[in-house]
Amino acid sequence: MANQRKFFVGGNWKMNGDRAGIDSIISFMKGPLSADTEVVVGCPQCYLMYTREHLPSNIGVAAQNCYKVAKGAFTGEISPSMIKDCGCEWVILGHSERRNVFNEPDTLISEKVGHALEAGLKVIPCIGEKLEERESNRTEEVVFAQMKALVPNISDWSRVVIAYEPVWAIGTGKTATPEQAQEVHAKLRQWLRDNVNAEVADSTRIIYGGSVTPGNCKELAKTGDIDGFLVGGASLKPDFVQIINARD
């Protein structure tokens, strides 16, 4: 089934960039990019409109976070409807930095995912274990618990791309080997089969995040259950194009 799931590469700019930097990214994002890869970039919220207006229409634009309700007294937050009003159709939710720096629990992330889907956005929910959890053989326990929290609020799986990002491999230069990453992706797909249904398991894209580079992307892309990448720092550099074209 892997070849029936369109390859997906997301770029997460995090809290980086200004208009001049975005202009340079837009310049190298003109490609050539593989037509067989869906590409989405997640920019800081103040640049959502600027990025959407200047990027080619075949590249999606995502917010990096949103809140769980449409409007109200929630200073500093943005809603899915605001993201849509900026012309964007994606949001990244539950990134490890939201979980670990801002202490967002599974329940809140799940509520955010649910509201974003109800509002018509497409969602990239992120899951993943810390180094101490992997070293104590708790990877499955942790990622399955994160998935279990998400599932009740997912109303439309066709608008969901799951990002598995082992926290110990984010920005550290450490990368899960293709075998390590494939093993977790296969177990996540089996979990979907057992806890949702076979159709969702076969059709849902599960992408990998964690120090993806031009040097390791092709080997990761060859595995059967890795359907793409969520890329951090490398998405700010021209090398990002090589990652987008990893299956070429």
From Swiss-Prot:
Region spans: IgE-binding: 16-30, 166-180, 205-219
pH dependence: Unstable only at extreme acidic (pH 1.0) or alkaline conditions (pH 11.0). IgE-binding activity is relatively stable under acidic and alkaline conditions, however the activity is increased between pH 2.0-3.0.
GO cellular component: cytoplasm; cytosol
Family matches, as Gene3D superfamilies: Aldolase class I
Binding-site list for substrate: N12, K14
Catalysed reaction equations from the record: D-glyceraldehyde 3-phosphate = dihydroxyacetone phosphate; dihydroxyacetone phosphate = methylglyoxal + phosphate
Broad class of where this protein is predominantly found: cytoplasm
UniProt temperature dependence: Stable up to 100 degrees Celsius. IgE-binding activity is reduced with increasing temperature higher than 60 degrees Celsius.
Tissues where the protein occurs: Expressed in skeletal muscle (at protein level).
Pathway this chain belongs to: Carbohydrate biosynthesis; gluconeogenesis; Carbohydrate degradation; glycolysis; D-glyceraldehyde 3-phosphate from glycerone phosphate: step 1/1
EC number: 5.3.1.1, 4.2.3.3
Keyword Isomerase: yes
SUPFAM superfamilies for this protein: Triosephosphate isomerase (TIM)
Active site: H95, E165
GO BP of this protein: gluconeogenesis; glyceraldehyde-3-phosphate biosynthetic process; glycerol catabolic process; glycolytic process; methylglyoxal biosynthetic process
Keyword Cytoplasm: yes
Pfam families recorded: TIM (PF00121)
Record localization: Cytoplasm
MF terms in GO: IgE binding; methylglyoxal synthase activity; protein homodimerization activity; triose-phosphate isomerase activity
Protein keywords: Allergen, Cytoplasm, Gluconeogenesis, Glycolysis, IgE-binding protein, Isomerase, Lyase
NCBIfam families according to UniProt: tim
UniProt family annotation: Belongs to the triosephosphate isomerase family.
Assembly notes: Homodimer.
HAMAP family recorded: TIM_B
Role, per record: Triosephosphate isomerase is an extremely efficient metabolic enzyme that catalyzes the interconversion between dihydroxyacetone phosphate (DHAP) and D-glyceraldehyde-3-phosphate (G3P) in glycolysis and gluconeogenesis. It is also responsible for the non-negligible production of methylglyoxal a reactive cytotoxic side-product that modifies and can alter proteins, DNA and lipids.
Protein name: Triosephosphate isomerase
Organism in which the protein naturally occurs: Procambarus clarkii
